[in-house]
A protein has these predicted regions:
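N-terminal cap/lid segment of alpha/beta-hydrolase-fold proteins
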Residues: 1-34
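Short, surface-exposed "cap/lid" segments of acyl-processing enzymes
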Residues: 30-75
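Glycine-rich "HGGG/HGxG" loop immediately N-terminal to the catalytic nucleophile
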Residues: 49-52, 74-100
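Structural signature of beta-strand start/N-cap positions in the alpha/beta core
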Residues: 72, 125-127, 151
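Conserved acidic catalytic loop of the alpha/beta-hydrolase fold
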Residues: 104-125
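Short beta-strand immediately N-terminal to the catalytic nucleophile in serine-hydrolase-like folds
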Residues: 106, 128-130, 155
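Gly/Ala-rich beta-loop-alpha elbow adjacent to hydrolase catalytic centers
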Residues: 130-134, 138
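Alpha/beta-hydrolase-fold enzymes
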Residues: 140-176
Length: 176
């Protein structure tokens, strides 16, 4: 990687007692921030953001690649993932609790970080990129905040398939 990148890590409050981990990468020389060149990544339901967007494969992560091209790049961990607040329910047996990060709560986390970035950079909009479950989360966030989104990018959305649905496999056993 030839360009010098700055990495910052911070937390953003979402709700009382819930802090969301955020990582930011940008060129060290980056001083002017614009809506068109600011990006927020959100992970799916399995792994936190940095493991999907900031693992340096071949020496450079996806975040590094975009940041080295002049973008101000952020990723966040939804509550219960990675370095964000671990809900109390995670200390109890799983059968005692519903899923930890439900979609409405995750959208609150994303919206809190979205508003934080807009205020921090003095911009009115930014680009959203979601992966898997993050596609659903980012779509809802974009619908609820259309005036704050330049573009919505969906990477591997869960509802688009090129193979027949297993729910409609026809008569007989699935063979699993």
């Amino acid at each position: 990687m030839s360009a010098s990148l700055v990495t910052e890590e911070m937390t953003v409050p979402s709700e009382p007692g819930i802090d969301i981990f955020v990582r930011n990468k940008r060129l060290a020389s980056h001083a002017v921030f614009t809506a068109e060149r600011t990006v927020l990544f959100v992970h799916g339901s399995t792994y936190p953001a940095h493991t999907g967007f900031d693992i340096p494969l071949g020496g450079q992560s996806w975040m590094d690649n975009i940041a080295s091209r002049g973008y101000d790049v952020y990723c966040l961990d939804v509550r219960g993932y990675g370095r964000s607040t671990r809900p109390k329910a995670m200390s109890e047996p799983p059968q005692n609790n519903p899923p930890l990060a439900r979609t409405p709560d995750a959208v609150k986390d994303i919206t809190a970080v979205l508003n934080f970035i807009l205020k921090r950079r003095g911009i009115a909009k930014l680009n959203l990129i979601g992966w898997s479950w993050g596609c659903s989360l980012m779509a809802i966030t974009a619908i609820q905040n259309p005036d704050k989104v330049v573009r919505l990018v969906q990477y591997a959305p869960g509802w688009l398939r090129t193979t027949p649905s297993l729910l409609n496999a026809g008569p007989g056993p699935l063979g699993a």
